[in-house]
């Protein structure tokens, strides 16, 4: 090594490192563990018990606890509510997306139902005999797996559905949607699930049980109020609840309820076991109905989902939604 190369500095000894004694390994006291187990079993112990009887009692108690916990969790599970589809039928010569059959829901109805923290599912039409996409899924599967059904508004109910012919071509309605929603409605009723119909849905409930409709209120009831105008949901009128109606109980104290009005058809002859829940004022057009042989199957002729945006003078229909969801929750019992 060259003499002019720098040398490393000498190491300076540090303070001595004190060695810590190793922590003793703790061995679990088997007697203590056995004691805890015995004390746990003691609450199930009875005089003269055999080991088999004691084991059966312990297993039975724990099974009941698990079942109660499952029931609590199931009842607290978020409700799953189905909404029927509106259907767009393409016109001849349409191109692109408008050349396809479309199924959709109006945003406000979904948001109104979800305002009570439930999950909303649009229910499509089904075709078990389809050539392209055959399926074994039926509308009954939806009725079994969902907790309730909302029937949307939309196109007219076809007069053929209540054994009439349309008096004008533009009142022909949507027969395909009628068939789909009637099956859907009956499937939910058959399994005891609640149904809430809005506008067209109200009319469909009446028709489903043998009722009929006015094809056009202005034509068929000349003295009636105008129930539809170009201002759409801004058009409104008063309603009244007949004595003993469930809506009258829900809205006890509301002196002059106001609702929107967006319909030119209306309930005419009531179906079997259908009772009137509300009339329009002063013309007496049916505005709400209820099917008496089910816990909750109700139709509202107005659109409750538009009321919040329409102003404070419109009837707050949250009690109706809450009653519908109560019935949905109770079907789990």
Please report, for each region that a protein language model flagged, where it lies by residue:
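N-terminal beta1-alpha1 cap of cysteine-dependent amidohydrolase-like domains
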Residues: 2-194, 207, 214, 218-251, ...
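Gly/Ala-rich beta-loop-alpha elbow adjacent to hydrolase catalytic centers
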Residues: 197, 201, 206, 210
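Active-site-proximal beta-strand elements of phosphoester/diester hydrolases
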Residues: 298-301
